[in-house]
Each structure stands twice: as C-alpha cells, then as structure tokens.
Amino acid sequence: MEDCIFCKIVQGEIPSYTVYEDDVVKAFLDISQNTPGHTLVIPKKHVKDIFEYDEELAAEVFKRIPKIARAIKASNPDIKGMNVMNNNGEVAYQSVFHSHWHLLPRYSSDDEFKINFTDHSDDYASEDYEAVRQSIADQFKD
C-alpha cells in the first residue's frame, strides 16, 4: 500500500530496528518503547486489521508470535511477563492501519503500562449473557 508506513518499512524505504524477519512477517522495535523491548509483529502482506486476515495468513502470523515472544523474554532476565495485543479500528486505538501485534515485555506491575478491565458483571443478568452469546453464535451458521 502506497502510503502505509509499515509497508514502507517492509520494503526498506524506512529504517527499522528489526529483531526478526522471514517471508511472512517482520518484527521490529516499536518506536514508542512503552516498555523496553516493545516489539511490533506485522504481516508483510498489507492487511488493515484482523477482519481482513484469511485463515492461512492468520495461522502463518500467529505461529511466529510465540517464537518472537520467547526471544524477547530471553533477551532480558528482568522480564517477568508479556502483553500480546492487537488493536482493530480507530475506536480500539489502532493508529497505523496495517495490522500489527504489540509484544510488550512486562518488568513489574508498576512499569507505567496499564490496561483497565472494568467489571460490568453486575450489569448483566443471565438473559443478557444468553442474548449476546446467541447473537455471536448465530454468525457461525451457514
């Protein structure tokens, strides 16, 4: 894609701090470094978001993520965990519209990276869960 910054990185038009590359993906340090070692994994093929993946591309990208995550973790004994995140759509904080997976090493719960999961379970009755479940399950019917 002509104006895509990640496509330009794949094509070598823009430099990156590449940690891993093969014929399917490229993994490079996120310029923001939310935590030290914050790495992006992108498919070399331009897909905007998760909704554009076919099963083959999804399998090829996802099977590489654990290997890259293990290398990041092994690179620093202070890494205690890792968040693996993918944002899809502007409302979900996607800022570059070439699908990418964030691998965020975690050093402690005080490392400035925060995710806020709010518990809304008190707002849902059994019937509400069932209605949501049914709506999603219906999408798998032929």
Name every feature range the model reports, one short phrase each.
Residues M1-D142:
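HIT superfamily nucleotide-processing domains
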